[in-house]
């Protein structure tokens, strides 16, 4: 019998392989402002939420450019690179295997919800999820609050739910919502940071030991 009845997935960095696109986006933004660029390793060591604090740490002047302006810049620049986006390895197979053993699957993302649904449809995996819940803004904020609203309307028992993410913040979200948590090391945070918060996997197909 499965240990969990529900899996709540993060999207960016967990199911979607967008770390390189994210770093390229930030480096273009930094370069236009004559700021120091980031390596992938530096990015994964430093990226976090709230995003405004991360932006400040890597050199953006939030007094000259408030979060709204930087967020618009990030979205438009990210979209230039988005044509190269793919799913992480084994995603369709892992999702199908979970469905076959009767576990319900959901997405909880900081991505704006309409964009999340568009991306799920473009990768033809939207039917694999019972519900996909995203943000109502472009600032990557409010993931815990969105999760709380999700729990209010869906028949999900937190104690029977595992969250799979790729950031320290995903572990914080899982804790706040009462979910179990496993973190994927191939996403937006370094493995050493993730290990301080939850069990980790280096490949999504290795998640099966947690069911």
What kind of region is each of these model predictions?
Residues 56-93:
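Metal-dependent phosphoesterase signature
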Residues 162-201:
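Acidic, Mg2+-coordinating phosphoryl-transfer loop and its flanking beta/alpha structural elements
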Residues 14, 109-111:
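Conserved phosphate-coupling serine/threonine residues in phosphotransfer and NTP-handling enzymes
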Residues 5-6, 143-171:
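Conserved Lys-Pro-Asp/Glu-containing loop-to-beta segment of HAD-superfamily phosphomonoesterases
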Residues 29, 50-64, 119-122, 150-151:
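Helix-loop "lid/cap" segments that line or gate small-molecule binding pockets
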Residues 43, 125-141:
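A short, structured active-site edge motif that brings together acidic residues
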Residues 1-45:
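Active-site neighborhood of HAD-like aspartate-dependent phosphohydrolases
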Residues 79-107, 117, 144:
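Short, acidic loop-to-helix structural element flanking the phosphoryl-transfer center
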């Amino acid at each position: 019998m499965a240990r969990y009845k529900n899996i709540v997935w993060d999207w960016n960095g967990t199911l979607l392989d967008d770390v390189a696109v994210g770093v390229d986006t930030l480096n273009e933004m930094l370069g236009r402002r004559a700021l120091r660029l980031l390596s992938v390793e530096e990015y994964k060591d430093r990226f976090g939420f709230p995003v405004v604090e991360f932006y400040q740490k890597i050199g953006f002047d939030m007094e000259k450019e408030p979060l709204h302006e930087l967020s618009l810049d990030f979205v438009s620049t990210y979209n230039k690179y988005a044509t190269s986006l793919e799913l992480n390895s084994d995603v369709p197979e892992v999702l199908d295997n979970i469905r076959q053993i009767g576990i319900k699957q959901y997405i909880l993302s900081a991505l704006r919800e309409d964009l999340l649904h568009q991306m799920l449809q473009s990768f033809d995996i939207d039917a694999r999820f019972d519900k996909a819940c995203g943000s109502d803004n472009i600032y990557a904020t409010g993931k815990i609050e969105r999760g709380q609203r999700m729990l209010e309307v869906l028949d999900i028992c937190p104690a029977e739910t595992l969250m799979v993410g790729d950031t320290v913040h995903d572990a914080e979200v899982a804790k706040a919502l009462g979910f179990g948590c496993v973190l994927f090391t191939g996403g937006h945070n370094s493995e050493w940071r993730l290990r301080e918060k939850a069990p980790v996997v280096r490949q999504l197909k290795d998640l099966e030991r947690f069911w």
